[in-house]
Amino acid sequence: MRSILMIIVVLFSSACFAQDSEQQLYYAYLDAEMDIWARHIDSTDWNSLPIAEQTVLLNYEYGYAAHAIGAKLEDAAYRLEQFAKHLEAHRAHLDSGIYYCYKTGVCSFRLSFERRQIAKQIKGIYENIKRAMAISPNDPFVLTMQCNVEFFNPIFGSKQKALMYDQKADSIYNTHADQYNYPRWNIRAMQMPLLQSMGYVRSKEEVLQKCNEILTQEPKFSYITGTFLPAYLKEKEKDKEKEKKK
């Protein structure tokens, strides 16, 4: 009887730890304290994890690889290849749409390192996101990736289409979040390109309204208060000055 109780205690403690860990990682994302993510990833043994927990860790590795590349960290290439390696190892346990969505991310990230293979990576981006959308057209994670593909393509991309995809993802997260088991940071990551797209194609009032809506949900979202809003308002002031000079 005592041994059974001990097992229950251990399992309960593990569940609480996992929950606390996810909450800690979520707030670290809000505060842009990504070194906490690095420590979490580095201290977790991929091979010892159950399949479900590998799926979760893979999502954090994806997010951290994006951060490392954007911040130009010394280990950015390593972080990308670590994620890419685990993605292939875990492929059989992922929905096909999500696998191709992640592959889109890998190709996008490799543009930062493989300058001689730009055409190959761009082709990979479009082939993989097309497959992902064909398989999982209503998955918010896939829709967010499609938004990014549209937003960051300076030639063939469309800010209007990017906004359309991200608004759909936003709506699905708000109404059917329980159907998707992504860690919560993915919702906030979706809202970053959503605001960026709105900044291009919507009025200042609409953009500020959306910022207030998100901050009402999550007041500690530092990307909005510390990065997006200051840059957006500064750009709007420049536009106003240009109009005065005409």
Residue ranges of model-derived segments:
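Short coil/turn connectors between adjacent alpha-helices in alpha-solenoid helical repeat scaffolds
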Residues: 27-35, 65-78, 108-122, 153-163, ...
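Terminal, low-structured helical/coil segments at or just beyond the last alpha-helical repeat
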Residues: 179-246
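Amphipathic alpha-helical repeat scaffolds of TPR domains
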Residues: 20-28, 47-69, 94-113, 138-154, ...
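Extended amphipathic alpha-helical interaction segments
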Residues: 119-187
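Boundary at the C-terminal end of the N-terminal hydrophobic targeting segment
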Residues: 16-18
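Sec-dependent N-terminal signal peptides
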Residues: 3-14
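Alpha-helical repeat scaffolds
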Residues: 37-47, 75-90, 119-131, 159-173, ...
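Short coil turns that delineate tetratricopeptide repeat
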Residues: 94, 137, 174, 216-219
